[in-house]
Amino acid sequence: MKAYAKANIFLKLTGFDSRKYHLLESRFILLKDVFDELELVDKESDSKKEFEIISNFKCENNIIQKAYLLLSRRYNNELKELFSKKSLKLTKNIPVCAGLGGGSSDCASFLLLINETLNLKLNLQELINLSIQLGSDIAFFLSGFHSANVSSCGEIIEEFEDDIPNLKWTFPQISCQTKAVYDEFDRGIFDFQKNNNQAQIYKKLSTKELLQNFKNKELNDLFTPCATLYPKMKSYLQEDFFLSGSGSSVFKVDR
């Protein structure tokens, strides 16, 4: 099963919820050319792990492990039987700490894979309700939408009929830590009401219109704090690249 990456075309921070998590308004688009792959493979006879992930990526305590534990609360016997014979193979291609949602997409694909394999018959809303307990962005990947306006903490998704130009991507060898970038944003000067007003305009425009008519700093509230924390990102900010998420992946319209 393919776990596709995403890009944020705009990302506006609009407040905090009761847990002090940031509220956002964003346009997510699916990147069909950038993906990880998940599959169930026969378990090696000498493996002692109850749930084993085989990967080219360090997987201890990652979000898939958390999803497995969450599902185990309701489907412990079914999962134990499945993973007594199978291991999960995860092939990572999506750059890590790059603002492309790789971990969230992997988690969504794992939930879909288990739902299908064990015939759990969980509907989309039930899967989204599970995903809210695991992290943001997962709901978008569960939806299967190619483009959507996403709000709150990532769990409210509205499909958007979009016009998406070809994008040319650059993946800097810079690991941008999401929490650090958000913390840097919080140290700056911001106006949540202004951000929300801008977001309401952006939500009505196509991706093509957004990238043609607005500057990178206007579209993504995290670009300036990202460049402050990671000075090598400043050149991309100055050269009119657009930032996905909290970085470090950047893009331009491929003209």
From Swiss-Prot:
GO terms for biological process: isopentenyl diphosphate biosynthetic process, methylerythritol 4-phosphate pathway; terpenoid biosynthetic process. Pathway: Isoprenoid biosynthesis; isopentenyl diphosphate biosynthesis via DXP pathway; isopentenyl diphosphate from 1-deoxy-D-xylulose 5-phosphate: step 3/6. GO terms for molecular function: 4-(cytidine 5'-diphospho)-2-C-methyl-D-erythritol kinase activity; ATP binding. ATP binds at residues 95-105. Disulfide bonds: none annotated. Pfam families: GHMP_kinases_N. The active site is at residues 6, 137. Its EC number is 2.7.1.148. InterPro entries: GHMP_kinase_C_sf, GHMP_kinase_N_dom, IspE, Ribosomal_Su5_D2-typ_SF, Ribsml_uS5_D2-typ_fold_subgr. It catalyses: 4-CDP-2-C-methyl-D-erythritol + ATP = 4-CDP-2-C-methyl-D-erythritol 2-phosphate + ADP + H(+). Keywords: ATP-binding, Isoprene biosynthesis, Kinase, Nucleotide-binding, Transferase. It is an enzyme of class 2 (transferase). Belongs to the GHMP kinase family. IspE subfamily. Catalyzes the phosphorylation of the position 2 hydroxy group of 4-diphosphocytidyl-2C-methyl-D-erythritol. This is 4-diphosphocytidyl-2-C-methyl-D-erythritol kinase. It comes from Campylobacter jejuni subsp. jejuni serotype O:2 (strain ATCC 700819 / NCTC 11168).
